[in-house]
């Protein structure tokens, strides 16, 4: 079998983590089988669909490394195909125009609710005569088009994740609306209908989507049969849940891929984490995967049925692993946009080699790329604010004399090196007859404003290169008076 799968997002919002995870599973399955991964934009909701959302979806997929083989195809450009399919069902007597008003539908639901029955359409307009249709039209009623569903029919399929699935026609809520009212006789085709037409036309072999589509699958199988088409294989993947076991939503914070990017997650770290959201690798100890490596191992036998809990701590850990293993030059490229967004200036000697030295200093401490903004602030600011602990340190006996001695020693240096910096510290310890700890703490506070921070010598070298070490030492001396 030639594997052909699709990801079919609706451009009514930014690329969602759930849609992206579905895209990951489709991509992995396609690559595992040497198949085709198709992008289809389901923009039949003309009122809510926006081109900026389409762009966000496509940009997000590319950023994650989920490049598609065919598409993008836009449903809004395929309406003729859908309307012909609606007409075919009408001509074959498999669908009909329903003129039931919204008020009548509401009254029906209330009556069913009063009896303790599940809401469903009672198919009252399934057998209208031409005269009855004409009368409804004369009354100014609009219509929807419904596909006939046999209440006695049992719909069975073997789900690649969940095994045997079985639904009765009577569980599907009555005859299915496949097109809403419009100016033409075939109406405006709806989502549940057009996806089937597209999947038939694009020869989709496997439909891989979230478990919240299971009820749709039962209805859509009947549509495949109505058109005499081959029914694809179905795989319904687990939903993404929050740590309390509820479906992940905006109330849980970030849910769109572009938001994750802004928060400082790498594409590799995020897509690695999404791969493990519901799928277990054969080697349970292996957690770090490239997409290509995961594709070699990916099967639906190892996709879980239970919901996948979104664990921020696990995502942070995975992300940090990718950051720590990214070469300095590449990591610098990743960090520059975050520094620019923070308004940091690269003037005053902060050239590319200097930036790469800064990245080398900070990289091991980064969990997210955004961490570099706060950690590097002291290197992009002309002055630093003293922390409470830093102020106390400068009031320690001997701190002022130590800092004055360091400035004096710097006057003899044309270019500070690591060895020269170490020698200055040794000289000051000996000349001032103080412990090395006092010198190191005083110097750190003078340069960084705090008693804690990145490697002191490397920080000093970076600040020296852009001429900020002496001014900060002088500032600290003034603060120690």
Swiss-Prot record:
It is found in: Cytoplasm. Keywords: Aminoacyl-tRNA synthetase, ATP-binding, Cytoplasm, Ligase, Nucleotide-binding, Protein biosynthesis. One of its GO terms (biological process) is glutamyl-tRNA aminoacylation. A motif ('HIGH' region) lies at residues 9-19. It catalyses: tRNA(Glu) + L-glutamate + ATP = L-glutamyl-tRNA(Glu) + AMP + diphosphate. Gene3D superfamilies: 1.10.10.350, Glutamate-tRNA synthetase, class I, anticodon-binding domain 1, Glutamyl-trna Synthetase, Domain 2, Glutamyl-tRNA Synthetase, Domain 3, HUPs. PROSITE patterns: AA_TRNA_LIGASE_I. It holds the Pfam family tRNA-synt_1c. Monomer. Catalyzes the attachment of glutamate to tRNA(Glu) in a two-step reaction: glutamate is first activated by ATP to form Glu-AMP and then transferred to the acceptor end of tRNA(Glu). This is Glutamate--tRNA ligase. It comes from Trichormus variabilis (strain ATCC 29413 / PCC 7937) (Anabaena variabilis). The gene is gltX.
């Amino acid at each position: 079998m030639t594997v052909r799968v699709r990801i079919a997002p609706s451009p009514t919002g930014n690329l969602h983590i759930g849609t992206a995870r579905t895209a990951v599973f489709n991509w992995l399955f396609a690559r595992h089988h040497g198949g085709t991964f198709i992008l289809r934009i389901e923009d039949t909701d003309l009122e809510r669909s926006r081109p900026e959302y389409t762009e966000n979806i496509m940009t997000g997929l590319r950023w994650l490394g989920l490049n598609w083989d065919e598409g993008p195809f836009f449903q809004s450009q395929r309406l003729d195909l859908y309307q012909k399919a609606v007409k075919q069902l009408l001509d074959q007597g498999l669908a009909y125009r329903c003129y039931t008003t919204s008020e009548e539908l509401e009254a029906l639901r209330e009556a069913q609710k009063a009896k303790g029955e599940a809401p469903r359409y009672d198919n009252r307009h399934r057998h209208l005569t031409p005269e009855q249709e004409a009368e409804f039209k004369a009354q100014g009623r609009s219509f929807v088009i419904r596909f006939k569903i046999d209440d006695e029919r049992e719909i069975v399929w073997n789900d690649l994740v969940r095994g045997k699935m079985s639904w009765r026609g009577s569980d599907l809520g009555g005859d299915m609306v496949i097109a809403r009212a419009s100016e033409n006789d075939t109406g405006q085709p709806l989502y549940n209908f057009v996806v089937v037409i597209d999947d038939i036309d694009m020869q989709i072999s496997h439909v891989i989507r979230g478990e919240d589509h299971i009820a749709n699958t039962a209805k859509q199988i009947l549509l495949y049969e109505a058109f005499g088409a081959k029914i694809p294989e179905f795989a319904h993947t687990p939903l993404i849940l929050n740590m309390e076991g509820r479906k992940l939503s905006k109330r849980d914070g970030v849910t769109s891929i572009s938001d994750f990017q802004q928060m400082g997650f790498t594409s590799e770290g995020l897509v690695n984490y999404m791969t493990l959201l519901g799928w277990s690798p054969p080697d349970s100890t292996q957690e770090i995967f490239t997409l290509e490596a995961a594709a070699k191992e990916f099967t639906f036998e190892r996709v879980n049925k239970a919901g996948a809990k979104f664990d921020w701590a696990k995502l942070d850990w995975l992300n940090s692993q990718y950051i720590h293993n990214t070469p300095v030059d590449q990591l610098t490229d990743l960090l520059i946009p975050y520094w620019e967004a923070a308004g940091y200036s690269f003037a005053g000697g902060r050239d590319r080699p200097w930036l790469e030295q800064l990245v080398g200093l900070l990289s091991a401490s980064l969990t997210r790329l955004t961490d570099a903004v706060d950690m590097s602030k002291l290197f992009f600011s002309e002055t630093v604010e003293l922390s409470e602990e830093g102020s106390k340190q400068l009031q320690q006996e001997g701190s002022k004399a130590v800092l004055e001695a360091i400035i004096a020693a710097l006057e003899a240096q044309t270019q500070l090196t690591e060895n020269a910096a170490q020698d200055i510290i040794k000289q000051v310890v000996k000349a001032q007859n103080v412990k090395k700890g006092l010198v190191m703490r005083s110097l750190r506070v003078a340069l960084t404003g705090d008693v804690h921070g990145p490697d002191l010598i490397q920080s000093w070298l970076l600040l020296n290169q852009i001429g900020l070490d002496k001014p900060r030492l002088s500032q600290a001396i003034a603060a120690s008076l």
